[in-house]
Each structure stands twice: as C-alpha cells, then as structure tokens.
C-alpha cells in the first residue's frame, strides 16, 4: 500500500473541504443586471424630477437686460469682502419669504416649475420684463451607508441622481454587499417610505426609487456570506477541525492495517 499517495489524497481532500466550507458567495449574488441580454436596448422614458420639500435650501437669481432693476431681488450677504447670494429655506408651510414678492409657495414643485412660477409672478405684477431665472437646490444630497467602499453623505449638483450614480460616488458595493435587496429610505415632509431595489435585475430601471431625491438614505445590507463570516467563523473552524480529525483517524487506521 502506497502510504504517501494516501496521505497526499487525504491532504487534498482536507483543502477541498476547507475551501468549500469557507466559500459561500456565487456569481448570481454579485453580478448586476443578470437578465439583461447582449445588445438589448432599454429606453429611459422616465421624466422623473425631484420635488421641493420642507427644509430645502434654495437660491434664486434673476437677470434681465437692465441689471439695475433686478438688484432688489438678488440680495447678497458680505462674506470676507465678497458678495454671496442669499439663500432661502422652505419653511414648514412650504413657503420662502422672497424680496418684493413676499411669501412664495414652492412645496411640491420641480425646479423647472419653480422657475416658471417666479417668471409668472414677475410678469403678472409687471415687475420685470423677460427675466431669466436661475433656481437651484443647495442642499441636494444623498446618504449611502452599509456595505459600500466609501459610505458617507454626497452632495448632488444636478436636478436628479440615480441610485447607480450614488453607489458609484460611494465607491460601489463591497464584495460583501447584498445587491438584490438595497433599501432606500425617503422622507417627504415628515412621511417616510421604505423601498427595496434589486440591482441584479434589469427591472431596476423601472423602480420608483431608481432616481433619488434630496436627502434619500441608501442602505446596503451584508449578504449571507458576510453574515455567516461574522457569526459562523467559529462554527466553520469547528467543522474543519472535526473533518481533519476524522480524516487523520482514517489515515492512522489505514496505515496500521
């Protein structure tokens, strides 16, 4: 009987079993858009635009050919010798207190709708002729937490950001992040909604939370492999020890007979 050959085979068996016990993740747990076919076209018909909320901080800049007539609207504060355009907080009633116009209700409007509202008010009151209105949300940010490489709060410069873009800002998911059950927490005027999204399915593009709104919270939970690793390292170690013991016992029995 070739004892060396038996020892080699048993050693290989131990290594294979150890690898099997410690490797739980599979391709289907990691790859995005798994049911998307090659060269398949998905038309983005979503015209989603974030709506203004209570607590949003906005800036409104008005311009006309005659800049002198817009000065009462473009109030500035002096910061270090430089003029900085004053911003406005949307109050609990959904209004801002704007120069000359007074209370302006912005709650629930998109940025474009807010621009048009100001233009209409200037026109109706015969205050400005053909004004250009630049309206921005200054505190548009999203929070990404959990199993991502760079969790944190990320400012957004545009009018909308997709969940994929937000995860990209956070350095993408770690290998331990669960891709099929990402949680998006959204707060609109005190009412919170909780929506799950599956990045492994191409239908993610049709999700109502594919495009995020200001102050959305994105949480990536750990996958089963990570959970098992956190709570089951000792258990796996015990299984490996027991397996090794049984194989060693078998080896001793074989060599003695």
Predicted regions and their residues:
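Ser/Thr/Pro/Gly-biased, low-complexity, turn-/loop-rich segments
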Residues: 2-6, 20, 24-257
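Bacterial N-terminal signal peptides
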Residues: 12-20
């Amino acid at each position: 009987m070739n004892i060396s050959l038996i020892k080699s085979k048993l050693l290989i068996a131990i290594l294979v079993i150890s690898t099997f016990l410690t490797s739980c993740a599979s391709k289907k747990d990691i790859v995005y858009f798994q049911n998307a076919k090659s060269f398949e076209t998905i038309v983005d018909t979503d015209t989603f635009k974030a709506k203004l909320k209570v607590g949003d901080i906005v800036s409104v800049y008005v311009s006309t050919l005659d800049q002198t007539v817009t000065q009462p609207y473009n109030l500035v504060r002096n910061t270090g010798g430089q003029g900085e355009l004053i911003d406005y907080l949307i109050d609990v009633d959904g209004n801002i207190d704007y120069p000359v116009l007074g209370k302006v209700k912005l709650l629930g409007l998109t940025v474009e709708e807010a621009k048009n509202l100001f233009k209409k008010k200037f026109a109706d009151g015969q205050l400005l002729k053909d004004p250009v209105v630049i309206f921005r949300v200054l505190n548009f940010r999203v929070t990404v937490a959990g199993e991502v490489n760079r969790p944190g709060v990320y400012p957004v410069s545009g009018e909308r950001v997709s969940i994929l873009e937000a995860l990209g800002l956070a350095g993408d998911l770690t290998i331990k992040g669960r891709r099929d059950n990402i949680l998006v927490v959204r707060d609109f005027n005190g009412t919170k909604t909780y929506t799950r999204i599956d990045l492994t399915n191409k239908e993610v593009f049709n999700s109502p939370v594919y495009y995020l709104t200001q102050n959305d919270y994105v949480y990536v939970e750990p996958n089963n492999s990570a959970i098992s690793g956190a709570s089951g390292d000792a258990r796996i170690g015990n299984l490996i020890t027991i397996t090794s013991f049984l194989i060693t016992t078998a080896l001793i029995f074989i060599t003695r007979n």
